[in-house]
Amino acid sequence: MASIPHYDYLVIGGGSGGVASARRAASYGAKTLLIEGKALGGTCVNVGCVPKKVMWNASDLAGRIRQAKEYGFPDVDPKYADNFDWSGFKAKRDAYVKRLNGIYERNLQKEGVEYVFGWATLYKQEGQEFPLVHVKSDDGNTKLYSAKKIMIATGGKPRLPDVPGAEYGIDSDGFFALETQPKRVAVVGGGYIGVELAGVFHGLNSETTLFCRGQTVLRAFDIMIQDTITDYYVKEGINVLKGSGVKKIVKKDNGELLVTYEQDGAEKDITLDSLIWTIGREPLKDTLNLGEFGIKTNKRGYIEVDEYQRSSVDNIYSLGDVCGKVELTPMAIAAGRKLSNRLFGPTEFKNQKQDYTDVPSAVFSHPEVGSIGITEAAAKEQYGEENVKVYTSKFVAMYYAMLEEKAPTAYKLVCAGKDEKVVGLHIVGADSAEILQGFGVAIRMGATKADFDNVVAIHPTSAEELVTMR
């Protein structure tokens, strides 16, 4: 029997977190192998943040085309925005993603990380000192590897409901496979993915319905964000079906979808060209053999890890979406690098770990959302209502002074204690993601309301409102 290739560090999952951790480990001289089942870059690069933002840009540009005449360009017909070349743009977007896949591959090569494509299974064999990983490629070939340390960063996948005809809908991955633009589309789910996709479709002139279980979208965010985005989506003409749930889907002979849903105790029907499920995500761990290997998962199936990313089995680690803790690409990258620093780096990194508090996040809705820290409700529960002071501002950004349409801008600072430490910052409006990045530094450094007040405002900007609120 041929000897089994052995590594210092074996990473299962070639997404952002896995690649970052593998590259960092290799930079310290660790012999490193990375295993990826599909395409390098994971969800973010292939079917997430990157192509989503490209589509958001197109939708945002369509909105600006519709506004151009009011900004002094009389020859720009607003109807130009309705003539979006979906299939042509998809090809261009896919080519961009493929270039990024190549960049990821070259970066691994540059750091000396070996990599193979295939699906990994943890494997125990009598007499083996180190755990084995069995890898099966799509062409059926199999190979065994062993490693001193293994890290699982396989990510997540869209969750699908158990309703009749669910297979006639597509998930958020399927959104990026659409070759033509559906003219009548429904998005099921009021979380950030559903809100983003509904905004893209609406901006590109698809007749858009958004099924929402509650009375507001984005229920994981501060109530100001929930109300502002929900109200504006309704105002803009998105068919937001509050308190609704899809019961079944029937595909007609002509390809149309007849969707039956329940709302306010009554069953109703709607005919669509496409339906997209965005009801949540779950860990991608189907082939891993976690149970037999003794790796504990929680009730939702996510791998349980401690503050140092250690699983319940010695020398097996995990991070990213498969752990279900702050499922954001930059968080997985940061956690992956810190794990490799601790495992393979100099002694000053021996206790390094990722802090999962005060993580800035954005929703690329229309308009954008930015949030860091805790909500107003959470602050009052944590600190006591009498110890929390909230500053809010709702206004129309200067950009809209020339326009009949008035998109909302809403800002909130949640402050706690006598020194009014800013424990939550929540914003809705143009460029919220870009604005939040800088303010995220301030929140992480423990800024107080007085610190905000002592900053000279940049005028005229929307962001100046955050340092002038009283």
Curated annotation (Swiss-Prot):
**Alphabetical list of PANTHER family matching this protein:** GLUTATHIONE REDUCTASE
What does the note accompanying the cofactor annotation read? Binds 1 FAD per subunit.
Task: Please name the Pfam families in this protein's record.
Answer: Pyr_redox_2, Pyr_redox_dim
- Molecular function GO labels: flavin adenine dinucleotide binding; glutathione-disulfide reductase (NADPH) activity; NADP binding
What is the stated purpose of this protein?
A: Catalyzes the reduction of glutathione disulfide (GSSG) to reduced glutathione (GSH). Constitutes the major mechanism to maintain a high GSH:GSSG ratio in the cytosol.
Q: Name one GO cellular component term.
A: cytosol
How would you classify this enzyme at the top EC level?
oxidoreductase
Q: Which InterPro entries does the record associate with it? A: FAD/NAD-bd_sf (IPR036188), FAD/NAD-binding_dom (IPR023753), FAD/NAD-linked_Rdtase_dimer_sf (IPR016156), Glutathione_Rdtase_euk/bac (IPR006322), GSHR/TRXR-like (IPR046952), Pyr_nuc-diS_OxRdtase (IPR001100), Pyr_nucl-diS_OxRdtase_dimer (IPR004099), Pyr_OxRdtase_I_AS (IPR012999)
Which GO BP terms sit in this record? cell redox homeostasis; cellular response to oxidative stress; glutathione metabolic process
Locate the residues binding NADP(+): 190, 193, 196, 213, 219, 280, 327, 362
Gene3D superfamilies, alphabetized: 3.30.390.30, FAD/NAD(P)-binding domain
Which residues are listed for glutathione binding in this entry? Answer: 16, 23, 104, 228, 337, 412
Q: Which organism is it from?
A: Yarrowia lipolytica (strain CLIB 122 / E 150)
Q: Please write the reaction equations for the catalytic activity of this protein.
A: 2 glutathione + NADP(+) = glutathione disulfide + NADPH + H(+)
Work out whether the entry's keyword set contains Oxidoreductase: yes
- State what protein this is by name: Glutathione reductase
The residues that hold FAD are 16-17, 36, 43-44, 52, 120, 321, 329, 459
What PROSITE patterns does this protein map onto?
A: PYRIDINE_REDOX_1
Protein family (similarity comment) = Belongs to the class-I pyridine nucleotide-disulfide oxidoreductase family.
The answer on whether this UniProt entry bears the keyword Acyltransferase reads no
> Major location, coarse class?
cytoplasm
